[in-house]
């Protein structure tokens, strides 16, 4: 009986503890990212932001969570009740399970699988289903139009995002996210310089993927009231909200992993190795999240035709050309990784 416990039950307990250790801090980070966003945008607009609930407004996310938790969930009369309830759950769960393959530091990863890149792409592709189901189940033309916009936008920019990732795979030779980070220790500086434009394209693509400004067409308030979540209140709205911000942190972590060296120090200086890798990872992710907030505070919303033109007529040809360019240069200079 003891051997059965150690062989089957004990590993499951360890996995459950790891999941809790990732999920709980992530939800706290998501809650306080909303606070940081309101403070940063307030400063950029020369106002204070939240400053009443607790010292410096630090308890504002908790007050918001309590308010949403105790509000009455209202389900529209002619909606599909089951799908209406399931949609925000799907969106929130998918935003969490992507973290399973993210390496926070050397050896600090829940599932160090050899197809981590494919796993991330699969999760990002599935996230559109929660939004589509929410728009359709709400039985509202505004919600449905927002969901259609979101699906078209996410599918359009996933193409260029996938091609950008191919350029990274050409230089690193692995689908394992930890392997991609470790490969960046030895990549020549000129290859990093060649990947820099693709890093910018990837960041633009994930802005569209997460429906953030200047690409927040699915929830354009002036046109669609609130988009696909217009009929949601209480915890349904909260789960969509948490999912959006968890996805923001996830795509920032992916950008860090692919282009900024993940948990590696930014410079090859010996004393920087004394600082834990998790600190560097968190610092880089925090910088990218600040860029998200900066863009939201400064840039206007694109028109929908401009959004699609940018995705299909600018970013897609550019990434296709860059895949050919990178592969040709790597082959000519004999820097193609051995797989």
UniProtKB/Swiss-Prot annotation:
The keyword Repeat does not apply. GO terms for biological process: aerobic respiration. One of its GO terms (molecular function) is NADH dehydrogenase activity. It catalyses: a quinone + NADH + 5 H(+)(in) = a quinol + NAD(+) + 4 H(+)(out). It is a multi-pass membrane protein. Its EC number is 7.1.1.-. The chain crosses the membrane at residues 10-30, 50-70, 82-102, 115-135, 161-181, 187-207, 235-255, 275-295, 310-330. It comes from the Bacteria. One of its GO terms (cellular component) is plasma membrane. The keyword Signal does not apply. It is an enzyme of class 7 (translocase). NDH-1 shuttles electrons from NADH, via FMN and iron-sulfur (Fe-S) centers, to quinones in the respiratory chain. The immediate electron acceptor for the enzyme in this species is believed to be ubiquinone. Couples the redox reaction to proton translocation (for every two electrons transferred, four hydrogen ions are translocated across the cytoplasmic membrane), and thus conserves the redox energy in a proton gradient. This subunit may bind ubiquinone. PANTHER family: NADH DEHYDROGENASE SUBUNIT 1, NADH-UBIQUINONE OXIDOREDUCTASE CHAIN 1. Belongs to the complex I subunit 1 family. NDH-1 is composed of 14 different subunits. Subunits NuoA, H, J, K, L, M, N constitute the membrane sector of the complex. This is NADH-quinone oxidoreductase subunit H. It comes from Rickettsia canadensis (strain McKiel). The gene is nuoH.
